[in-house]
A protein has these predicted regions:
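Non-transmembrane, aqueous-exposed alpha-helical and coiled segments at domain scale
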Residues: 2-109
Length: 109
């Protein structure tokens, strides 16, 4: 998908389809334009991108690698977007491994 904006103001990373859509709907309800993406690289015209990593059932190391790979396609330099990690309400998934990978990708150690 080739559209005008190549950098969102908010980026949400979810580990499954349901979580991605839940986050997207919540942000749309408060006035944001939202795109939900399932693969990278992605270019869209919404102010919010929600990325479904589909990593919930993966081994933690593989989930972290998936997050690192997804984030490598995003424009994080020069005024990076607000990055949000969507966490399952019952705490399923690779929360620690994915947050650590997101922090590294964003230059936070």
């Amino acid at each position: 998908m080739e559209k005008g904006i190549t950098k969102p103001s908010i980026l949400v990373v979810a580990d499954d389809f349901t979580g991605a859509n839940d986050a997207g709907v919540s942000l749309a309800q408060v006035g944001h334009t939202v795109d939900v993406a399932f693969e990278m690289p992605y270019r869209g015209d919404a102010s919010v991108w929600v990325i479904n990593s589909d990593s919930r059932a993966m081994d933690p190391k593989l989930a972290a690698m998936k997050i690192t790979s997804l984030m490598s396609h995003l424009p994080l330099a020069n005024n990076p977007p607000l990055v949000i990690k969507k966490i399952d309400s019952t705490l399923r998934g690779n929360i620690g491994a994915e947050i650590e990978a997101l922090m590294k990708a964003c230059g936070i150690t």
